[in-house]
Amino acid sequence: MAMAKAAKELIEKNVHYQDGTPVECVISPCTIGGAEAAKCAEYFSTQNVCASLAVTPCWCYGSETMDLSGDTVKAVWGFNGTERPGAVYLAAVMAAFAQRGLPAFLMYGHDVQDIDDNTVPDDVAEKMIRWQRAQLP
């Protein structure tokens, strides 16, 4: 959940509505994977969520963690780590989104990070902020 918390902090600090009110990010109380995906979707439906950002520090099956709701705009941050490169995950999940006709925005850092580095790299931060600003009314 460290990546999700870092993304939440970055977005809430840097993205605001036209009246200056910061956007609010909601993190699911459980991780998305298998049966938990339905719990996350149900929780998000009660929180007025309009966009979803999936993050993972590990290689996993993209279809396990992807948001299949047609009601939200999607983005995925794949961690570029020394032990677990997220490029394979990103390619798999982006292909799955494309096969389902769901547009999604991908984020992948240029520089490799250590697995215990929970910071959002500058290039990813710029992509994340731009993506989130595009979701505002």
Please place each PLM-identified region on the residue numbering.
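An N-terminal assembly and electron-transfer interface module characteristic of large anaerobic redox
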Residues: 1-137
